Amino acid sequence: MPFITHIKTFAALGSGVIGSGWVARALAHGLDVIAWDPAPGAEQALRQRVANAWPALEKQGLAAGAAQHRLSFVSSIEECVRDADFIQESAPERLDLKLDLHAKISAAAKPDAIIASSTSGLLPSEFYESSSHPERCVVGHPFNPVYLLPLVEIVGGRHTAPEAIEAAKGIYTELGMRPLHVRKEVPGFIADRLLEALWREALHLVNDGVATTGEIDDAIRFGAGLRWSFMGTFLTYTLAGGDAGMRHFMQQFGPALKLPWTYLPAPELTERLIDEVVDGTAAQVGERSIAELERYRDDTLLAVLEAIGTSKAKHGMTFSE
């Protein structure tokens, strides 16, 4: 069965931080959006989050016809998905909830509409088990803020058709994203596994009194993080090998991998460690509100994305290379 690849109506189930980010991105790309969330006050909270994201999206550039009023909020799953060309679920990370939700979504949706889940920790073969037409079901795992960060990890389950993966890649690309196909179902996918390793080491460094939360963030944002934003890890290390490249780098620094630097297992989250992390991040935040920091984050991300795009174009590269 061919799947819908060019969409006009986007369904969003779940309207928290991730779900609202999807809604804002879809609206900014000129789509009609139908949203559903059973939580009390969900519609008002969703519209406020979209309004908060809109200034950054305006700076980035809106598609023709993009408007916040193209968001509809409905009271049932069936109303949300039955006319949708693409469906994105962003419900809480509970297997029982997602099993029930996707059985209802797939029963009411068009049979050729791709169904995606924003899950970061559950595997698609598990929670799409009760879905009808599971061949069109994928994971589409985004990163916060969804309306600005382009990466989306696409993961198929045991029943997912290759054509569904390709359809999802095309749809996300039309939404201005950089789809990354995760070839195997593994917990945490790709990006979160890398982030989790860094998070574990950071917690150990705080726990052992080596550094404060602010010092660890400085080590990233004034060092490796700057290179990571446009080169990633492997290309950075290729350059570290000089003219001889990655082979020389691995021969020279490979033995260091066996040194007992890494802690690997996570530290126990004692009250003392939690207090140190909370107090440290509170000091970093200072008197600024979360809303102020979100605006700072969005403006800075826009500047970084623009700078990367400009520099890549200068060197004959596209943004997604």
UniProtKB/Swiss-Prot annotation:
Record-annotated disulphide pairs: none
Intracellular or extracellular location(s): Cytoplasm
SUPFAM superfamilies (UniProt xref): 6-phosphogluconate dehydrogenase C-terminal domain-like, NAD(P)-binding Rossmann-fold domains
Gene Ontology biological-process annotations: carnitine catabolic process; fatty acid metabolic process
Enzyme Commission code(s) on record: 1.1.1.108
A Pfam family this chain is assigned to: 3HCDH
Catalytic activity, as annotated: carnitine + NAD(+) = 3-dehydrocarnitine + NADH + H(+)
GO CC terms in record: cytoplasm
Regulation: The enzyme activity is strongly inhibited by Ag(+), Ni(+), Hg(+), and p-chloromercuribenzoate, and partially inhibited by Li(+), Ca(2+), Mn(2+), Co(2+), Cu(2+), and Zn(2+).
Residues that, per the record, bind NAD(+): G14, S15, G16, V17, I18, G19
Comment on pH dependence: Optimum pH is 9.5 for the oxidation reaction and 6.5 for the reduction reaction.
GO function terms (MF aspect): carnitine 3-dehydrogenase activity; NAD binding; NAD+ binding
Subunit note: Homodimer.
Record family assignment: Belongs to the 3-hydroxyacyl-CoA dehydrogenase family. L-carnitine dehydrogenase subfamily.
Name of this chain's protein: L-carnitine dehydrogenase
Natural source organism: Pseudomonas sp
Gene for this chain: Xt-cdh
